[in-house]
């Protein structure tokens, strides 16, 4: 028997009807004592999990503000960091800015995150909201 390449097999499958393919799969499972259900279930779970992740992203209510870099106007960024993060002294704010990327605010609402991002970007910093 001549060995068929993957392309040859795919071409043969393309010419078959769904009913014929279904019968082929049943015979394949019986002949080799395998099941095609496990890979199909995993593949089906993938998009469902992705859809759930996308839905969770839409409903996200808590955000993290991360300082990626201070940019060229470091002093202005330090001042804004002291304003945004309560209880920071000058040295702590400077250390935080110098050690970027660092989270500045964690689990804040969208308005607070966008407000902080706007102030930091106006001061010359690079910021991401996650």
Curated annotation (Swiss-Prot):
Signal peptide: none
SUPFAM superfamilies: ClpS-like, Ribosomal protein L7/12, oligomerisation (N-terminal) domain
Pfam families for this protein: Ribosomal_L12 (PF00542), Ribosomal_L12_N (PF16320)
GO cellular component terms given for this protein: cytosolic large ribosomal subunit
An example Gene Ontology molecular-function term: mRNA binding
UniProt keywords, alphabetically: Ribonucleoprotein, Ribosomal protein
A biological process from GO: translation
Record-stated family: Belongs to the bacterial ribosomal protein bL12 family.
Function: Forms part of the ribosomal stalk which helps the ribosome interact with GTP-bound translation factors. Is thus essential for accurate translation.
Stored PANTHER family: 39S RIBOSOMAL PROTEIN L12, LARGE RIBOSOMAL SUBUNIT PROTEIN BL12M
Quaternary context: Homodimer. Part of the ribosomal stalk of the 50S ribosomal subunit. Forms a multimeric L10(L12)X complex, where L10 forms an elongated spine to which 2 to 4 L12 dimers bind in a sequential fashion. Binds GTP-bound translation factors.
Protein name: Large ribosomal subunit protein bL12
């Amino acid at each position: 028997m001549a060995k068929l390449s993957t392309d040859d097999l795919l071409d043969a499958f393309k010419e078959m009807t769904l009913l014929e393919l279904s019968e082929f799969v049943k015979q394949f499972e019986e002949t080799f004592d395998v099941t095609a259900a496990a890979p199909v279930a995993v593949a089906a779970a993938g998009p469902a999990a992705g859809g759930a992740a996308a839905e969770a992203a839409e409903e996200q209510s808590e955000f993290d503000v991360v300082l990626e870099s201070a940019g060229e106007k470091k002093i202005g960024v330090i001042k804004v960091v002291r304003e945004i993060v309560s209880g920071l002294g000058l040295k702590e704010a400077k250390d935080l800015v110098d050690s970027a990327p660092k989270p500045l605010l964690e689990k804040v609402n969208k308005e607070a995150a966008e407000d902080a991002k706007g102030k930091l970007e106006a001061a010359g910093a690079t910021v991401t909201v996650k």
